[in-house]
């Protein structure tokens, strides 16, 4: 039986183009969202386009360990490592949420070597808006 002839330029074998377009980003914004269950770190450029992101869950932490300060530190380190390779030198930090990972993520960002222009707390606070849910009785 004859062998099937393979096409020279089949789409499976040839990669069309680079999937991620790497560009030099000198300045960016680091968003840290720290809840009690997880910490999400997103790095954007000045216009708000996402460059890199990481969370405690994607770093391999499961369950209640995602809300720990060490998990937040690891997530921040992973998100910043990719953008520092792209040449980011200055950043602004926006921290949102009441979680345990706020300070640990900020410590990891400071240690990364990126110069911080300012650190802003953007946690949403109601001006007596909607009624809050009832307190848990444990």
Swiss-Prot record:
Q: Which InterPro entries match?
A: Ribosomal_uS11 (IPR001971), Ribosomal_uS11_bac-type (IPR019981), Ribosomal_uS11_CS (IPR018102), Ribosomal_uS11_sf (IPR036967)
Q: Which PROSITE patterns match?
A: RIBOSOMAL_S11
Q: Which GO terms describe its molecular function?
A: rRNA binding; structural constituent of ribosome
The answer to whether keyword Repeat applies is: no
Q: What broad class describes the main subcellular location of this protein?
A: plastid
Q: Where is this region: Disordered?
A: 1-22
Q: Which SUPFAM superfamilies match?
A: Translational machinery components
- The keyword Ribonucleoprotein belongs to this UniProt entry's keyword annotation: yes
Pfam families named in the record: Ribosomal_S11
Q: Where in the cell is it found?
A: Plastid, Chloroplast
A GO cellular-component term linked to this record: ribosome
- What's an example GO BP annotation here? translation
Keywords of this entry = Chloroplast, Plastid, Ribonucleoprotein, Ribosomal protein, RNA-binding, rRNA-binding
| Domain of life of the source | Eukaryota
| Family, as annotated | Belongs to the universal ribosomal protein uS11 family.
Q: Which PANTHER family match?
A: 40S RIBOSOMAL PROTEIN S14/30S RIBOSOMAL PROTEIN S11
Q: How does it assemble?
A: Part of the 30S ribosomal subunit.
Name the UniProt record assigns to this protein: Small ribosomal subunit protein uS11c
At the highest ranks, the source species' classification is: Eukaryota, Viridiplantae, Streptophyta, Embryophyta, Tracheophyta
């Amino acid at each position: 039986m004859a062998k099937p002839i393979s096409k020279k330029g089949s789409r499976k074998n040839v990669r069309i183009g680079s999937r991620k377009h790497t560009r030099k980003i000198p300045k960016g914004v680091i968003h840290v969202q720290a809840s009690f269950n997880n910490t999400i770190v997103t790095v954007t450029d000045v216009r708000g386009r996402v460059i890199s992101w990481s969370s405690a869950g994607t770093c391999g932490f499961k369950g209640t360990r995602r809300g720990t300060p060490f998990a937040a530190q690891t997530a921040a380190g992973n998100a910043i490592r990719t953008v520092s390779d792209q040449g980011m030198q200055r950043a602004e930090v926006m921290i949102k949420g009441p979680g345990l990972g706020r300070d640990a993520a900020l410590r990891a960002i400071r240690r990364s070597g990126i110069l911080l222009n300012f650190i802003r707390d953007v946690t949403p606070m109601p001006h007596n808006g909607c009624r809050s849910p009832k307190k848990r009785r444990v």
